[in-house]
Amino acid sequence: MRDVFREATPMTCRSPLPDLRDMMEKLTVFEPTIDSTVETQSTSSEEMIPSSPSPPPPPRVYKPCFVCQDKSSGYHYGVSSCEGCKGFFRRSIQKNMVYTCHRDKNCQINKVTRNRCQYCRLRKCFEVGMSKEAVRNDRNKKKKDVKEEVVLPESYELSGELEELVNKVSKAHRETFPSLCQLGKYTTNSSADHRVQLDLGLWDKFSELSTKCIIKIVEFAKRLPGFTSLTIADQITLLKSACLDILMLRICTRYTPEQDTMTFSDGLTLNRTQMHNAGFGPLTDLVFAFAGQLLPLEMDDTETGLLSAICLICGDRMDLEEPHRVDQLQEPLLEALKIYARRRRPNKPHMFPRMLMKVTDLRGISTKGAERAITLKMEIPGPMPPLIREMLENPEIFEDSSDSNDSGAAAVVPAPNIKRMGQRQAAWVKGERPEWVRGRRRGSKSRYKAGFKAGKARSRDSPDNNGEIRQGDERSEMSVRAEQDFALE
């Protein structure tokens, strides 16, 4: 058995060996196939999956700012500098700044002290090599890079109603105020060389022309759409408040800068000295200055007419009965002037607000004119023409000749009593109401009354118990002329 086992054992042990070798050989042959498949799969998968982005490069490190040693943001105008010193140098060059050192012109410039002395900071900018030409070239480059936007002017068209309004106002202005080219100019040698307090000859001529101008202004007002629909009281209030504004505006549009003269409606041409001697006095230079300010506006007759209408129809005047109606009439005038002015000057949209600003200037001149009228009344020998007196002077400065009389009527004396005006103010300060204002009601038409009775102010057209007009109420000159001569309806 042992021999059999001994003989059998090697056979049994040997038999599997070839199989294992064969398997190993087969395995060795098969290995490259496996490797190539894996490699092919890996390659195809790499092609399908995108590769991850490469890491960003490290930030670029610049040398500290050559001027203040702060952290640099790059090379600006030739040197490494921070944003602060870059902007400071650019502004200094572009605006041609001139700085002053309050010490010895050798201040230390660093991150902390750089804002203390601009002179030394700019000097150090030049010392470290910043280039002035680089600033200018950079500025020109930006101008070339920026595309110029073509801004087309807005199209302004008047509606049918506004077009009709403009035509009516323009026609009313032209028919009551001839243009300078339509006048035959003539001059006078009266006191043309030196200023005097008052030239009576020029004053007589000027007062005559002013009265005619006032009549033309009333005629102009009547032609404005909607003006005669206002109450008579409001028409008179607006005329008295704006008459001097329109008068000054009209005469200033006839200013000739080459000769420094102004021309009136009949062609009379006066220089600055003659205007002073004719009664303008200290108001002369103010009027001529305003006339010079109108020249750049280059207003035509239509714009002058619209601006005159805006001055006249203004709801902020005192003692108006229906200010809201006046405002309603003014709104289309403002809109018409805005559209007309911008349509006439599409590239100058600021002209309309500049025109409106002249209304404020005119009111200032009118206030000075009313003050001048008071002193002028004391200089002229005779009475002032009634229309001029009514337009230029505040009716409250006139005194009644007597506080009361038997008939109950009080006559108005057309002369200002400055002393009495001071007494009135003193009485108000003491809390005492003067006799002439006792019983006065707020909101009444006291501004248009001319008579007083028993120390009580009465309304101009207030009826008594029998329904008739009270005997003591005399019509003012403006009221009578407005209703009769000019037929204000």
Curated annotation (Swiss-Prot):
PROSITE patterns: NR_LBD, NUCLEAR_REC_DBD_1, NUCLEAR_REC_DBD_2. Residues 62-137 bind DNA. Pfam families: Hormone_recep (PF00104), zf-C4 (PF00105). Signal peptide: none annotated. Residues 37-57, 398-489 are annotated as: Disordered. Transmembrane segments: none annotated. One of its GO terms (biological process) is cell differentiation. Residues 37-51 have a biased composition (Low complexity). Its main location: nucleus. InterPro entries: NHR-like_dom_sf (IPR035500), NR_DBD_RAR (IPR047159), NR_LBD_RAR (IPR047158), Nucl_hrmn_rcpt_lig-bd (IPR000536), Nuclear_hrmn_rcpt (IPR001723), Retinoic_acid_rcpt (IPR003078), Znf_hrmn_rcpt (IPR001628), Znf_NHR/GATA (IPR013088). SMART domains: HOLI (SM00430), ZnF_C4 (SM00399). Keywords: DNA-binding, Metal-binding, Nucleus, Receptor, Transcription, Transcription regulation, Zinc, Zinc-finger. It comes from the Eukaryota. Residues 470-489 have a biased composition (Basic and acidic residues). One of its GO terms (molecular function) is RNA polymerase II cis-regulatory region sequence-specific DNA binding. The keyword Nucleus applies. A zinc finger (NR C4-type) spans 65-85, 101-120. GO terms for cellular component: nucleus. Residues 161-395 form the NR LBD domain. Heterodimer; with an rxr molecule. Binds DNA preferentially as a rar/rxr heterodimer. Receptor for retinoic acid. Retinoic acid receptors bind as heterodimers to their target response elements in response to their ligands, all-trans or 9-cis retinoic acid, and regulate gene expression in various biological processes. The rar/rxr heterodimers bind to the retinoic acid response elements (RARE) composed of tandem 5'-AGGTCA-3' sites known as DR1-DR5. Required for hindbrain development. Belongs to the nuclear hormone receptor family. NR1 subfamily. This is Retinoic acid receptor gamma-B.
